[in-house]
Amino acid sequence: MAVPAFSDIAKSANDLLNKDFYHLAAGTIEVKSNTPNNVAFKVTGKSTHDKVTSGALEGKFTDKPNGLTVTQTWNTANALETKVEMADNLAKGLKAEGIFSFLPATNARGAKFNLHFKQSNFHGRAFFDLLKGPTANIDAIVGHEGFLAGASAGYDVQKAAITGYSAAVGYHAPTYSAAITATDNLSVFSASYYHKVNSQVEAGSKATWNSKTGNTVGLEVATKYRIDPVSFVKGKINDRGVAAIAYNVLLREGVTLGVGASFDTQKLDQATHKVGTSFTFES
């Protein structure tokens, strides 16, 4: 099993707890298309419960033989971003990427340079913000027979100071995984567990404790049930009594509908509930 990136050591549990729940926005739409000359387009739009709308247009060109990918994004805030990726050119498993952003309204500019190096039992990354600081964030994970251990650290060059550090351990198996992370300078601890019970049922949970704020432990549990090959339902609830449900179905080839809702079970008589929908079109 491939060694994940540091931020993905608890990915299975985090995806089960957070992905495909549609209540966070009143409505979202995503349109994807591909051209014969290796150019992919994606248009996204979102309307929040506060009636704020936003959107983005993305174009991506991929040259697989040379390991080159160029992505250009333009959003409704009139922010422009260009991302250039080069994979496996200098060394097998090494990917370099440059991210350049520009906001015409304020003339703000951004430039970032990132490195990803992946081998069978190692996954390391380095993120450099060239115009702010500059700053560097580096993380790495080593793995052996499913066992994982990793750490991350941030450094501000101008201040000559470490800006933060984290650590994590985990275990990944084909049908289950577990991870313990310590973030925010080893002050916020999380333990997560994921289990693929069978081809239809998945279950997971996550407990979080912030040593700076007290003894209260936050808990979330979630499950996913695949009804048939084209649809599934998900549900979750946390220790505060906030529950969420979601339904996802492939209406036809290239068209997916998602519907979700959240409820505060402690305040069922109040207008704290949220409902959202999502449409995805892909060609």
Swiss-Prot record:
CDD domains: Porin3_VDAC. GO terms for cellular component: mitochondrial outer membrane; pore complex. It is found in: Mitochondrion outer membrane. Pfam families: Porin_3. InterPro entries: Porin_dom_sf (IPR023614), Porin_Euk (IPR001925), Porin_Euk/Tom40 (IPR027246). Transmembrane segments: none annotated. Gene3D superfamilies: Porin (2.40.160.10). GO terms for molecular function: porin activity; voltage-gated monoatomic anion channel activity. Keywords: Ion transport, Membrane, Mitochondrion, Mitochondrion outer membrane, Porin, Transmembrane, Transmembrane beta strand, Transport. The keyword tRNA processing does not apply. Belongs to the eukaryotic mitochondrial porin family. Consists mainly of membrane-spanning sided beta-sheets. Forms a channel through the cell membrane that allows diffusion of small hydrophilic molecules. The channel adopts an open conformation at low or zero membrane potential and a closed conformation at potentials above 30-40 mV. The open state has a weak anion selectivity whereas the closed state is cation-selective. This is Mitochondrial outer membrane protein porin. It comes from Neurospora crassa (strain ATCC 24698 / 74-OR23-1A / CBS 708.71 / DSM 1257 / FGSC 987).
